[in-house]
From Swiss-Prot:
The active site is at H117 (pros-phosphohistidine intermediate). This is Nucleoside diphosphate kinase. PANTHER family: NUCLEOSIDE DIPHOSPHATE KINASE, NUCLEOSIDE DIPHOSPHATE KINASE DDB_G0292928-RELATED. The gene is ndk. Belongs to the NDK family. The keyword Electron transport does not apply. PROSITE patterns: NDPK, NDPK_LIKE. It comes from the Bacteria. It is an enzyme of class 2 (transferase). Its cofactor is Mg(2+). Homotetramer. Keywords: ATP-binding, Cytoplasm, Kinase, Magnesium, Metal-binding, Nucleotide metabolism, Nucleotide-binding, Phosphoprotein, Transferase.
Amino acid sequence: MALERTLSIIKPDAVERNLVGKILSRFEENGFQIVAMKMLRLNQAQAEGFYAEHQGKPFFDGLVEYMTSAPVVVSVLEKDNAVKDYRTLIGATDPQQAAEGTIRKDFAESRRRNSVHGSDSEESAVREIAYFFVESEICPR
């Protein structure tokens, strides 16, 4: 097993509904160490930059509008096999398809308002973490 990092974003719908504490508890209960965290409100340029790979897709503008609608909580999580384990913990993008007990099944409102984002690969995790954090902001434990 290899110690990995992954990026988590608690999205606007979950922040607005005061679910941040419940979601962070799920991370820790499942063995993740929170090694960096910040709350911020993304501006349009930040959201477009983060989701640049989706530019030109029909859902892009709505995604950017949603991600800039309220604050988000961005964190770096660390554990063995973090990327895979986090994806399992959050569940399928569509909460109706998500397994019982996953964050999206328990908290998400819809496919877009699905409460959390998680890196989909180790390569994405490295890129996404660097988008929001400099190495000196990450505090391994």
